Regions:
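Conserved helicase/translocase motor-coupling segment
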Residues: 1-62, 68
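A cross-kingdom feature that marks ATP-driven nucleic-acid transaction machinery
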Residues: 52-220
Length: 220
């Protein structure tokens, strides 16, 4: 706080809590600022500016409390400015900060996978792909779909979906569909909590349990 000359420690604390509560969710400074101003009824000179929130987020990432994961257009080959995702460097600290509430296992598992990829020296992005579909009126539209992680290590690239469970065919199709839209043949993996033995589906996508994934360094 002293080193960065933080003037509003209350806002820094609120930003910290919001990031802890939204790991794995798309986040941008504008939405956070609007949320804080609305909840705390801040107006005029007392209102929180977007740039202030951005600065505080940067400070938290510089302190290695959070890591920013940017969104990447897989086929357009470019990064989006916002929104991005933020993951806790230490899940234990995150849980302690929010009093061990909000134990959404889907987001926690996603955070653990992200941290593991970083530990394995991968550069990690969130993948964005597009599919051509029709709206309710039968008119064509572009739909953005997300791949949880693109892990890059030199010339190696790996697409990864984090899925706590795939209880039915509909959910399985939902998780697999973005893989078919990448336009390339790099390996694709779904890391799951509900299986123990690894197997490949008909599209060549590896389904692997979270424990198996964390213990096998050869995957990446």
């Amino acid at each position: 706080v002293e080193r960065r000359r933080i003037k509003r420690e209350d806002i820094l604390s609120a930003v910290l809590d919001l990031l802890c509560s939204s790991v794995g969710s798309l986040t941008n400074p504008t939405n956070i600022a609007n949320s804080l101003n609305s909840k705390q009824k801040l107006k005029g000179e007392g209102a929180v500016a977007n740039n202030t929130v951005k600065q505080y987020i940067d400070n938290l990432t510089d302190a290695y409390l959070f890591s920013e994961c940017r969104r990447y257009d897989v086929r357009g080959k470019g990064y989006f400015d916002y929104p991005n995702k933020y993951y806790c460097e230490d899940i234990g600290l995150r849980n302690a900060r929010i009093g061990f509430r909000q134990q959404e296992m889907t987001h926690i598992m996603e955070n653990i996978i992200y941290n593991e990829l970083v530990i394995r020296d991968c550069m990690v992005d969130v993948g964005v792909v597009y599919s051509s579909e029709k709206d309710d009126n039968g008119k064509p539209k572009q739909v953005a779909r997300e791949i949880d992680f693109i892990a890059n290590d030199g010339e190696k690239k790996l697409y990864i979906q984090s899925a706590f469970a795939l209880p039915d065919e509909e959910k399985a199709v939902q998780e697999n569909k973005p893989f078919s839209l990448t336009g390339d043949y790099f390996p694709k993996i779904i890391v799951r909590h509900d299986i123990t033995k690894r197997w490949y589906n008909e599209s060549g996508v590896l389904n692997i349990g979270i424990v198996d994934f964390l213990l096998d360094d050869s995957i990446i």
